[in-house]
Each structure stands twice: as C-alpha cells, then as structure tokens.
A protein has these predicted regions:
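Acidic/His-enriched low-complexity segments
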Residues: 1-116
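Hydrophobic alpha-helical and helix-loop surface patches within well-folded domains
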Residues: 49, 80-227
Length: 227
C-alpha cells in the first residue's frame, strides 16, 4: 500500500473511494462496488469505485486492462472473473466453483461472505502468486489454463485459499505484520476444508501433507526461523 498515502498497518482499517480514468477500450476493477462510469468524450472514461466497509490499507487495489468480464453470482452477490480475452471460454472452468465455495465457507463459518461483490482478476508479471485484496482477488497468469492444461493442474487450492482470506485476513485481520502467519495459516486451512468437502478426506490429507513437507523444506532455502 505504498502507492498512495496511508498508515500502512494491518490494524489501521479504513473505507476508500477510487476514481480510475482509463481508455474506453479497457475496463477497471477495485474494491467494493462500481458506483458509476462517466464517459469523458476524449476516448477515456472514469470509473468511481467505493468500498464503504473498513479494511486494511494493504488490501486496497486497482486493476485496468483489456479484460473479458465473465459474470457469475452467489445468492445476491455479483461474482465476476476478469481474464484475458483468449481465456474467456475457459473462465468458468477455472473459477466456476467459486459460488459453491462461497456458500460452503459461509455455512461452515456461520458467517456469510461479508463484502458487496467478489471478483477475481488475472494479471501478468505479478510479483507473487496471488493476493486477497478485499472483494477483488488478484491472480498471476499461471492460473489461466485451457481445458487440456487443467488436466495437469487446476490451481483450485489457490482459489479457495484467497477466498478464505476474505474472512481471515480481510474481515478479521492480524494486529501487526509479524502476525501475518495467522492470516496465512487460516487460509491454508480453508484449502483443506474445501478439498475435504468437495473431493474427500484422502485428497485433503494428502495435500495437507504436501503443505507440511514444503513448510519444513523452507528452512533449507531461507535464513529465517520456522514459525
């Protein structure tokens, strides 16, 4: 959240409004709800996004690009998938379990998905794998796969992980940066819960074992203590 003035602490929550002026051939995405769009008459348009529920500054985002927007829905909540246009035919293959995940997590936690929309956008050259921006998760391009490529890997664990963050990380946020493992551990547990529900305990246990193995192996390549 160093791209705009802010108190950059996870326990400093705020609402936010963002105006994004973009070429008319592009679309934008940010947190919360798209309130309106103004055509500027010069080949640009300005989108007004508003998040009126408090969240941590590091979760504020904006994206602009030549995306296809594939619309979905969970209950009365808009669920949208922003993908490169070549992957529009595969968007619901990639992200189509999202509404079912939202229903499952809402029932499992006894607390409905708390934000006014849920969008997932795919971008290139992102510095990490994915990011759980409030109501607008960002994924690296690796998640875009056609039907044949998805036979090898679906990355559905990433999708469930980032969605579970909408409760643990976004709605409930750790007090300080040193407590970030709390956010991540809950989201990893969300992966397990989804796999157990959707695919059975055997697969969930296997993937949990793989996560545990990778966790221990990190000590070989990082000069930091295991948490």
């Amino acid at each position: 959240s160093h791209w705009f003035p802010t108190i950059d602490k996870p326990n400093q929550k705020t609402t936010n409004e963002i105006y994004i002026t973009r070429p008319t051939k592009y679309v934008s995405l940010s947190n919360g709800t798209l309130i309106n769009t103004k055509e500027n008459g010069n080949g640009t348009a300005t989108d007004y996004w508003k998040m009126d529920l408090p969240h941590a500054p590091y979760l504020i985002m904006m994206a602009v690009g030549d995306f296809a927007i594939i619309k979905d829905r969970w209950r009365d909540v808009p669920v949208n998938y922003y993908v490169e246009k070549d992957y529009a035919p595969y968007a619901k293959e990639i992200f189509g379990n999202t509404p079912e995940m939202m229903e499952f997590f809402s029932q499992k936690l006894g607390f409905d998905y708390p934000w006014p929309q849920y969008a997932q956008v795919v971008v290139r050259d992102y510095v990490s794998g994915a990011m759980e921006n409030t109501s607008a998760t960002l994924h690296g391009e690796f998640i875009q796969r056609n039907t044949r490529e998805r036979l090898d890997e679906t990355y559905e664990d990433v999708i469930s992980h980032e969605l579970f963050h909408q409760w643990f990380g976004d709605l409930i946020t750790c007090e300080s940066w040193s407590n970030i493992p709390l956010n991540e551990s809950f989201a990893t547990y969300g992966e397990y819960l989804w796999n157990e529900y959707k695919y059975g305990r055997t697969l969930a246990d296997y993937k949990q074992y793989e996560n545990y193995r990778k966790y221990l192996e990190e000590a070989a390549g990082k000069n930091v203590d295991l948490v």
